[in-house]
A protein has these predicted regions:
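PLP-dependent class I/II
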Residues: 2-8, 21-23, 28, 35-42, ...
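Short, contiguous pre-domain boundary segments
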Residues: 8-16
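Glycine-rich phosphate-binding segment of PLP-dependent enzymes
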Residues: 54-73, 87
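Short, surface-exposed loop/turn segments at secondary-structure junctions
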Residues: 73-74, 298
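Conserved AMP-binding/adenylate-forming core of the ANL superfamily
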Residues: 82-86
């Protein structure tokens, strides 16, 4: 070794990155992709991504925007017509929204990240409802926040856990995350539960993040109530949404947040200094998605509902109760106590990719996504049965 060579790592990275691990969802997806690259047929039930194409008219709107030269910067918070369309949708959900209260972001994840960075200082208390989407925890830790977790298992409904939430939230709590319709559980919280959140938030003067990205993917007579539509919550709620799930636009990267103008003014500083703006032509496609895709979205939702029934019925026939999801395209499958080992065996032996529940704060479960064809779902369960995993 020469004198010039160093025995230390070349980069001394920030302490904050040591607080988090890589995304568990992406890690499993990468492992599935590596197996497939080696010629292995993997049934991937790990990814939270619709298997339907982006609606054709939305794709055409994106192409038209490119042809029209919409390739430069936009106003940092988004093009006015898209913000108007988002505000119109929010008003339909009972939220008194104006375009000035909207920030358009490159994906719903960016909207969440900007919200946490805007509200959370080192040492601030943040409450999560478990099971919770994996990136909430990472975002809070990157901001230096301290987590308190409230378990909703085994029902995965918030209403039975309201007393636990009341105990968890104090005057020192800065923020509560509420994700309904829920990833990973497929639960839609009752109005009584949401009113309980409202009462707790008002009592302790706490801000609420309402992640409603699955709001258009609900089944039967189930309807989602937007938290910010409740009296007393509009002025303390940041509503997060995006285009990835309902419009099958995951790779387009388009999302949004809504809050009062005071919050938007502060969050807009971070937004402008970090991402400048969401991609111009993608925003134009988003306008088309909001205004001209109701029938296409409903067709996708109907297909997901059929798949949900297939999952529930197939597992019920084997004596496994996963409950009936009210929304999204996920089911929480009860497995051995060591869910990490179960998920690793499922992909290594059965070549079925799932996600261990511990990644969501739900040990003893695996999350399966039914954003896959009925044939592939049947194939996945056949493999899991054959390998003694069910």
């Amino acid at each position: 070794m020469s004198d010039a060579e160093s025995t230390t790592e070349p980069w001394e990275t920030s302490e904050r990155l040591g607080r988090v691990e890589p995304s568990a969802t992406l890690a499993i997806g990468n492992r599935a992709a590596a197996l497939e690259a080696d010629g292995v047929d993997v049934v991937d039930l790990s990814v939270g991504e619709p298997d339907f194409p982006t609606p054709a008219n939305v794709v055409e709107a994106g192409k038209d925007a490119l042809d029209a030269g919409h390739t430069g910067y936009t106003s940092s918070n988004g093009v006015p017509e898209l913000k108007r369309a988002i505000a119109e949708k929010l008003r339909g959900d009972g939220i008194g929204a104006s375009p000035e209260e909207v920030i358009v972001t490159p994906g719903g994840k960016q909207a969440l990240y900007e919200t946490v960075q805007t509200l959370v200082d080192p040492g601030d208390e943040v409450v999560l409802l478990d099971p919770a989407w994996v990136s909430y925890e990472a975002m809070v830790k990157l901001a230096g926040g301290e987590l308190t977790r409230v378990d909703t298992a085994p029902s995965f409904q918030l209403e039975p856990a309201l007393d636990d939430l009341r105990e968890a939230v104090t005057d020192d709590t800065e923020l509560v995350f509420v994700n309904t319709p829920s990833n990973p559980t497929g639960a839609v919280y009752t109005d009584a539960a949401l009113e309980g959140v409202r009462d707790i938030a008002v009592e302790h003067d706490v801000a609420v993040v309402a992640d409603e990205i699955y709001g258009q993917i609900t089944y039967g007579d189930v309807e989602q109530t937007s938290l910010a539509s409740l009296d007393g919550l509009a002025e303390r709620t940041v509503t997060i949404n995006g285009f990835s799930k309902a419009y099958s636009m995951t790779g387009w990267r388009l999302g949004d947040l809504h809050a009062d103008e005071a919050f938007v003014g502060e969050a807009g500083k971070l937004h402008s200094h970090s991402v400048s703006c969401a991609t111009n032509f993608v925003q134009r496609a988003g306008i088309e998605a909001l205004r001209e895709t109701d029938d296409t979205v409903q067709e996708m939702v109907d297909a997901f509902e059929t798949r949900r029934d297939l999952v529930v019925d197939t597992l019920a026939d084997a004596g496994v109760d996963v409950g009936v999801s009210d929304c999204a395209f996920y089911a929480m499958l009860p497995v051995d106590d060591d869910d990490q080992a179960w998920a690793e065996e499922a992909i290594a032996e059965a070549h079925v990719a799932t996600l261990p529940g511990n990644a969501f704060g739900a040990p003893g479960y695996a999350r399966i996504s039914y954003a896959a064809s009925e044939d592939r779902l049947r194939e996945a369960f056949d493999r899991l049965f054959d390998h003694g995993l069910l």
